Amino acid sequence: MQLFHLCLIISCSCPTVQASKLCLGWLLGMDIDPYKEFGATVELLSFLPSDFFPSVRDLLDTASALYREALESPEHCSPNHTALRQAILCWGELMTLASWVGNNLEDPASREQVVNYVNTNMGLKIRQLLWFHISCLTFGRETVLEYLVSFGVWIRTPPAYRPPNAPILSTLPETAVVRRRGRSPRRRTPSPRRRRSQSPRRRRSQSPASQC
């Protein structure tokens, strides 16, 4: 919590730890979920185990390889691009802060505690954010949401009643446990045949080329 208070001191311009605690109370009173505007929730992401998410380094390399031009562009590409930019910048600032704290702590045990806290707690949140937005850009938001729902249903189903393998994002919708209901195409109901009039009519002569 000391590191978190230090973050709040910097971000909230609070000069003391006591002031940062007030800022912390204000933040905890707000219901902010970074996934809400994208149709997901923190709880939905929490169904995925922590070892599911690649390392931050791998995720950053993936984002750079696939979307570097768009991320560095001054143009607004999509909400996912914007959120991905913010997550990358946040991780960079967090690494800078953690390095500064580690270099200024004389106690080796305290330095180790700071590193473990950043990697275990904050690192997991950043990995979740990076994975979510990279996946949305790669596979589409609807596919990612369908995957999260399917995985959540799969992981909460007793092993005896669920498929042996978890859903795989890259193979949806084939491996989806629950599929979203889509609009089924309208079926045209056959119209009742009209009765032909009993009066004789002259039939049109059809050429062979006009027949289907």
UniProtKB/Swiss-Prot annotation:
- Coarse class of the primary localization is secreted
Give start-end of the signal peptide. Answer: 1-19
The residues bearing each sequence repeat, given as ranges, are 184-190, 191-198, 199-206
SUPFAM superfamilies of this UniProt entry? Hepatitis B viral capsid (hbcag) (SSF47852)
Is RNA-binding there in the keyword field? no
Q: Which residues form the propeptide?
A: 184-212
Q: Known post-translational modifications?
A: Phosphorylated. Cleaved by host furin.
GO biological process, any = microtubule-dependent intracellular transport of viral material towards nucleus
Q: Where in the cell is the protein located? A: Secreted; Host nucleus
Question: Can you state the subunit structure given in the record?
Answer: Homodimerizes.
Q: Member of which family?
A: Belongs to the orthohepadnavirus precore antigen family.
Q: What is this protein called?
A: External core antigen
